[in-house]
Amino acid sequence: MTIIAGTVVKGKQLGRKLGFPTANVDAKIHGLRNGVYGVLATVNHQFHLGVMNIGVKPTVGSNLEKTLEIFLFDFHRDIYGEKIECSILFKIREERRFDSLESLTKQIKKDISCVAKRFELIGIMAPNKKESLLSHQELNLPDLCFYKKCNNLYGVNRGVYNVIDNWFFEYGITQVAYRRIYILSFLSFLKEDNPKVSSKYIRFGAGGLADKLNRFISSYVEESEENILG
């Protein structure tokens, strides 16, 4: 999976002025699509949920350099100069230009609310609270019990669950609770991709499961790098 690593640097602090302080990250972001994402960030070995923007900030200028900034939920510490790792879980929209800073501010509020809701639906954020549930007991259930949770929520059978779990393990996500976040995020993506299906069971359609995983990841990877499964 895509993990972005870099150092938090001081930016122009526009987010802070708008009421949404962000961590500007000096990192290699070549190959990633501009847009707004739900992410899992790691600072000092602690997990934090957040909203990430990759892009050129077209509302505040033109011909600007592509940057990466992250808003972390319920986080108020100064981390300039510290290392941060960020794993993309899902994308909510493309980057776009707004007519005014007021319009931009309204959209940022919507983005934060949208990402928080997605985290709630996945099961890793408490409703009405910006606290992480990464240590929540459901993410640390015995494997069979966690599979049954996925089956009840998304109608995935045991064989498909095992394939998905193994994929993320092979991508280097070896920590169990961390990997289960990806599993829930992917299953949520599959369900959204089939909104008109009346059955509670997931349907894969043409291309099967491998195609769905490619689409899940290619939502944030540039076209030249989309076919990650070869």
From Swiss-Prot:
It comes from the Bacteria. The keyword ATP-binding applies. GO terms for biological process: riboflavin biosynthetic process. Pfam families: Flavokinase. Disruption phenotype: Mutants lacking this gene are deregulated with respect to flavin (riboflavin, FMN and FAD) biosynthesis. GO terms for molecular function: ATP binding; riboflavin kinase activity. It catalyses: riboflavin + ATP = FMN + ADP + H(+). Keywords: ATP-binding, Flavoprotein, FMN, Nucleotide-binding, Riboflavin biosynthesis, Transferase. Its EC number is 2.7.1.26. Induction: Repressed by the HTH-type transcriptional regulator CymR. The keyword Glycosyltransferase does not apply. InterPro entries: Riboflavin_kinase (IPR023468), Riboflavin_kinase_bac/euk (IPR015865), Riboflavin_kinase_dom_sf (IPR023465). Overexpression of RibR suppresses the riboflavin-overproducing ribC-defective phenotype, which is the major riboflavin kinase responsible of FMN biosynthesis by riboflavin phosphorylation. Belongs to the RibR family. May be directly involved in the regulation of the rib genes. C-terminal part of RibR specifically binds to RFN of the rib leader of the riboflavin biosynthetic operon. The RFN element is a sequence within the rib-leader mRNA reported to serve as a receptor for an FMN-dependent riboswitch. Possibly, RibR produces the comodulator FMN through its own N-terminal flavokinase activity. FMN-activated RibR may stabilize the anti-anti terminator structure of RFN mRNA, causing transcription termination of the rib genes in trans. This is RNA-binding riboflavin kinase RibR.
